[in-house]
Design a protein with these regions (language model features):
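Proline-rich intrinsically disordered, low-complexity coils
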Residues: 2, 27, 31-34, 51, ...
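Short, conserved DNA-binding cores of transcription-related domains
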Residues: 1-74
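Short, positively charged, Gly/Tyr-enriched micro-motifs
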Residues: 65-157, 169
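Long C-terminal interaction/binding lobes of large macromolecular proteins
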Residues: 1-11, 132-209
């Protein structure tokens, strides 16, 4: 599994694709061997299914046998799609009478309600955990705030709290769980990370540039 790192772009998904911003991504040295000598080099790109046309720049360390990728802020980590799309799902559940009602309202494809509920739950469960962690991790921003999308958006006076939180919690991203952070999937299923908590999502397989 590639190690994901933050690529601060300030771009929307459409702008990222239009500008081919992955070409602007830079990783000046190996995160594992900052002094060099490991053969660290750019290693093409891999594609994300959504938004269409999205490519992610990556690098490879031969000595460490590790691949590193720079994930732009608008994309969800180890989940398909964008942070905004996942945030919309969670916000819909917060406002709905039940998770089933939210899933029924959100489903657009001809899938069963049970499948839609599973799809929604896979997004809601990790994000609810993340929001609770963020409130405790960043008291300077969220002290006394309820761990909900609505409450955190109101506190930050923003429309997209997950993208904003990736900026605020940038020094913790390797410990925070997906879809916000880049935590290792070995802590999937709600197990406790030595630093925070991890949860595994899904990510498309890498493809050559």
């Amino acid at each position: 599994m590639p190690v994901q790192l933050r690529f601060k772009t300030g771009l929307t998904g459409a702008d990222y694709v239009t500008r081919e911003a992955w070409r602007e991504a830079r990783l000046l040295h190996c995160p594992v061997h900052p002094r060099g000598g490991c053969g660290f080099a750019r290693h093409g790109t891999y594609a994300r299914k959504s938004p269409a046309g999205t490519l992610i720049a990556r690098w490879y360390c031969p000595q460490g046998h590790r691949t590193f990728s720079l994930l732009p802020d608008h994309l969800a980590a180890r989940f398909p799609g964008t942070l905004s799309e996942i945030e919309r799902v969670v916000a819909t559940v917060e406002q709905a009478s039940s998770l089933e009602a939210a899933a029924d309202a959100l489903r657009s494809d001809p899938v069963t309600l049970a499948s839609a509920v599973r799809w929604v739950r896979r997004r809601v469960v990790p994000v609810r955990g993340l929001l609770t962690v963020l409130v405790g991790l960043l008291p300077q921003f969220f002290l006394g705030c309820a761990p909900t999308i609505c409450a955190l958006c109101a506190r930050l006076s923003c429309e997209r709290v997950l993208m904003s939180s990736r900026e605020l919690a940038q020094v913790h991203l390797q410990a925070l769980s997906p879809p916000l952070g880049f935590g290792h999937p070995q802590y999937a299923g709600g197990e406790r990370n030595p630093r925070l908590q991890q949860h595994m999502g899904t990510d498309p397989p890498p493809h050559p540039a």
